[in-house]
From Swiss-Prot:
NCBIfam families: PRK05114.1. Residues 1-22, 57-85 are annotated as: Disordered. It comes from Yersinia enterocolitica serotype O:8 / biotype 1B (strain NCTC 13174 / 8081). Belongs to the UPF0181 family. This is UPF0181 protein YE1782. It comes from the Bacteria. HAMAP family: UPF0181. Coiled coil: none annotated.
């Protein structure tokens, strides 16, 4: 799965491409058409157990870096490097 999109069969991929081309032939920009078809696909696969959540950067804004550390190990910039001159 890429970018939060469920895995699609070849037939589903072809249908998506055809929908995108249809929207574009009606005057919609390629970006808008792709976004619309992607939203439709996500909606159809909303309860799909194979669909994986993709997190936005803002999901982690409430946490400090220390929230993600597993131990008290020093940061790399705190370790003395014997090879530095």
């Amino acid at each position: 799965m890429l970018a939060g999109m469920p895995s699609l069969s070849h037939e589903e991929q072809q249908e998506a491409v055809e929908r995108i081309h249809q929207f574009m032939s009606e005057g919609m920009s390629s970006g808008e058409a792709i976004a619309l078809v992607a939203a439709e696909i996500r909606e159809r696969h909303q309860n799909d157990p194979q669909a994986m959540a993709i997190f936005e950067d803002t999901d982690f804004d409430e946490h400090d870096e220390s929230d993600y550390r597993r131990d008290n190990e020093q940061d790399a910039d705190e370790i003395e490097d014997p090879y530095e001159g």
